[in-house]
Every structure is written in structure tokens, then in C-alpha cells.
Amino acid sequence: MNFLRNYLDKQKPKFEKGGKLEKFHSVFTGFESFLFVPNTTTSSGAHIRDAVDLKRTMIIVVLALIPALLFGIYNVGYQHFNAVGGLADTTFFQLFFYGLWKVLPMIIVSYVVGLGIEFAVAQMKGHEINEGFLVSGLLIPMIMPVEAPLWMVALSTAWNPALLARAFFFFSYPSMISGDKVWIAGDTADAISQATPLAQMALGQPLTYSTADMFWGFIPGSVGETSAFCILIGAVILLLTNVASWRTMISVFVGGYLMALIFQPISGVEAYQQLLMGGFAFGAVFMATDPVTSAQTNTGKYVYGLLIGAMAVIIRCINPGYPEGMMLAILLMNTFAPLIDWFVVQANIKRRLKRAKAVAN
């Protein structure tokens, strides 16, 4: 790394003001910041000191996503060969590489288009390149069906957060992001139909998947959303590094479980199974905890998380037309997050004023 650092230091003057490549300054600084910690300092005293900067935060989130991504790649191959009937004669590596062949183009398109636009806009406007797309570029293919067209993945890079992209295509092109066939890779016209657990629940059918299948992830679904176990590994990474809020994360599961208990007679499935189906676990860990769109106050995080979990189950059970209620619940509560924080702050102000008056008297 010292060789690379020395090389960049020698090339840096060419990209600074007055250099031959001055107009590519944003591109150079983008690559430099990705590889090394920026050497810029504040003009006045720093008020907050922390070992984690934005780049490290984004990298931690990406690392937390890797277990779910790797299993998702394997599961794409597993579901394909299970549908066509050749699972017993297929090795682990055949399953994994088939899934990689299907998922890797989605990841490449997402990053190439998204980062390409990010670099181009930063270059035109002279802004610094934002590392945030390191996460969004991976989230987009992970929350899409494996059979989603690549043009859809490319267009998804225009939205942030990534969940908004899925919502847009869900309502604009429902046939490409719903049904039974889109979750199974390859030509499965003559294969056994594999409905997701959510679809079976919405149709009032008995679940053909065991709780173990749903926990480990051997079910059809979006690329990165099937394995609750791998998502749990990612949750531990986010919580140990303080990147995600445990208040929000736990509240989502609590709210979802309590509401699932209430609606258990309607849904026909066990309450805990609701937490393992669809994108509930993935949304609770990686989407609801987005520090930009979620509630900021501690009390607000509890309220925000409880409402997301409860609303996700309500949408699933009341409206079978939208079996994946987690997406709509998170987007709706993202809208109300500032209002939740406002009420929490106002309540705190009133409580302190009341306490001050009591002391004064």
C-alpha cells in the first residue's frame, strides 16, 4: 500500500488547481478517498472525534451485507435446480456458480451505472464524490427478483433510498417484480411452480416450507432477503460497530411479532414465522435503520420501529394484493419519522418546563 500511496502523491499535483488534469480533480479525489483516509482537516476545532468516518461506515454496511449476498447467490442456484428437478445431481459449487452467473451482472450494472453517474455529476459540478452508493449499489440487486431485467436494475440507481426503486417498479411494472416465476432464475416454463411463503399466505394456502427452511433461507424470494440467519450475522456486525440503532432494529421485530399475534387467526401462520417471511428481517436490519431516513431521537426510534413492524404485518394480512408489506411500511414511516421526532422533542421540552416550574415554586 505504501507503493500505491507514494504513486498517488506523485500524481496528485497534476489534478490540483493549475495542473494538467485539473478538470478531473473530483475523479482523482474519489479514488483516493476510497483507497485511503482523506488528509483534509477542519478549519476550526473539531467538536466530535470518532474513529469511524463515512467511508468506513459504508464499508461496514457492505461487509454486513456480504453473508446475505453470498447465500442469496447460492440460493438462486438452489431454487433453479429445485424447480427443474435436477437438485439431487448438482454439487454445491454448481449451485453457487449458477447463482453467481445470474446475480453478478445485476451487481455490475448497478455499480457501473450508479457510480458512473455519481462520478460524472461530481465532475461536472466540481463536487466531492459521495461514498453512499457503495451501499445502495449493492442493496439494489439484493432486493430485486433474480429475473429482474438489467435495464430495471440500471434505472433503479436513480432512486435513493434503494427501497424507493423497488416501490417504483412494483407499481409501474408489477408483472416483472411479482408472481411466482420472477423468483426462480432461468427458463422454468416446464418446471414446478414455486410460490413464496408470502404468496401462499396471501392465497390462504398452507405453507409448504418449514420454519427451518425460512430461517436458513431455502425459499424463493429476492436475492438477499431469504436467509434470516445470514441477515442476523449482518445485524450483529452493524450493532457491534454501532452503525445501526438497536432501538430501531429490535422495535421493528417486537412490533411485527405483537401484531402478528393479533392477526394470527387471519393469516393462518405462526406469529414468529411472519418475521422470517419475505423481506421483513432484511428490512428491519438494513432498511429501517437507515440513519438518514429513520427517526433520530431515542424515544422516536422505539415508536418508529414499532410502527414499521406493526404496519408491515397489517398490510400483509389485510391487503393480499400487497403481500410484501415491509416495503410500504418502511417508506410510509420514513415520511413520518421527522414528525415522530418533533412530538418527542416537544414532549421533552414540556416535561423540562414543568420540572423547572416545580423547582421554582
Q: What are the roles of these predicted feature ranges?
A:
Residues F96-S110, L150-A154, M214, F218-A228, ...:
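Structural signature of hydrophobic alpha-helical transmembrane segments
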Residues T42-I48, G114-K125, A162-L163, I233-T241, ...:
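C-terminal ends of transmembrane helices
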Residues M106-A120, G137-L138, T157-P161:
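Central hydrophobic cores of alpha-helical transmembrane segments in multi-pass inner-membrane proteins
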Residues H127-S136, V153-S156, L163-A165, W246-V254, ...:
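Cytoplasmic-side transmembrane-helix entry/capping segments in multi-pass membrane proteins
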Residues E128-G186:
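Membrane-interface helix-loop-helix junctions at boundaries between adjacent transmembrane segments
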Residues A162-L232:
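Long hydrophobic alpha-helical segments that form multi-pass transmembrane helix bundles
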Residues M1-I107, N361:
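N-terminal signal-anchor module of multipass membrane proteins
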Residues Y272-G279, K301-V303, G321-M333:
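Loop-to-transmembrane alpha-helix initiation sites
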